Amino acid sequence: TNVEGDFLDLVRLELNPKNPDEYGTPDGWQAFTHRTETIAIKGGPDQMVEIRETRWGPVAEEPLLGGPVALRWTALDPEAVDLGLVWMDQARSVWDALAVATRAGAPPSNVLLADAEGHIAWTYMGRIPVRRGLDGSVSVSWADGRTGWTGFIPPDDLPRVIDPPAGYLVSANHRMTDDTYPHVIGHAFANGYRAYRISERLRAMERVREPDLLALQLDTTTELHEFYRDLIRRLLTPEVLAQHPELAEAREAVEAWDGRAEKDSRGVALLTAFRRSLAASVFAPFLQGCREQDPAFAYDGDLDTPLRTLLTEQAPGTLPDPARFADWHAFLLHELERTVATLKADYGLSRVDALAWGVMNRVRMAHPLSDTIPLVGRWLNMAEEAAPGCGQCVRVLSGSLAASERMVVSPSHHSDAIFHMPGGQSGHPLSPHYRDQHRNWSQGLPTPLLAGRAVHNLTFRPEPASARS
């Protein structure tokens, strides 16, 4: 699974005022190197791309806040890409596999391992930079030599867990190390709700079989939204409802919520929209400076930790728009009223407690060409449909965010293995297999991993050399 780490830095370049083709380095001014890449276009002329290089990497095509930056990225480092994973099939224990994984050059990933002796392990795979003088969260100059990368984390220093007391391992794109780990891995990990829910389900299982783990992957419990449900409960007291009777349906909506994000779940749509509205309004004063520099700026980190802290403390100094609202209570009432009105208008409802989650949460899978050729979208895209799950559910499914694969397989029990994939096995829109797997993936129906009897054969024949000349 994805580490959600930070393996790219934008190095702010200091240009020589007397020669803009030179940039500052710890060794003084250095000239950019220039190279041309040729992009072959099928059926058309080759395209030439001019690239300026620095000692840290290529200069980005777009400036950052008006200034040039270089891309220092592990993926562009020859040392970070190799075929080391081919040795994994020689591993005979988790210790062998750990040695292979931690030394392989590949996109950084979470690696979970198990062996025939019952040992299990987790680690990171891929090259992760060792930073000096910076944590990678902002763009800075490396010209003075006090900041930059000093290399990659040595394989033996990569974090790992072997045979944990719980007897299982969980990886859900969340942070896997604590503050004692000396190296920066990232800044924008997924929050821990999905990982916590997976742990809860595994802890409760006495025996683990394939249907149990498929059911786990289809779990739609969303504990993240409980905070916002309780916030509405505290806000809408009988006294407040007497003054704002139009909000009674909001109280009824959250009381009707079953704690899940199923298609027919009531209340979770209101909680989702309320959370989104609160985040936009509460963070607006803090992000104003960012948006003055870049109107398209979007805060894309773990918003719930700071948001919940601000909503819990309700300090007068952090009240959004104090000229308009006397206190946090007035602000929260306004946000809830606006959220209810917006949902009713957007979905044509007379009551917000009638809004089912599937009306709001719809899965959209579009082919890249459908945006450029809209008329063919109906043949290229998967049908838009109501979907269970959410961004914080184990069954992650919200808009364009969804599980790209579900699989449950146990060695020596391949006949019981389960596999899900969206779309189909063919990439050809006219093939009967273009979308033949989508229904089972969408509805969570058990689908065998093993192919079974062949029903279709596809033969690849190399093009004759004469045809290529």
Mark where each language-model region is.
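C-terminal/peripheral segments of proteins
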Residues: 1-469
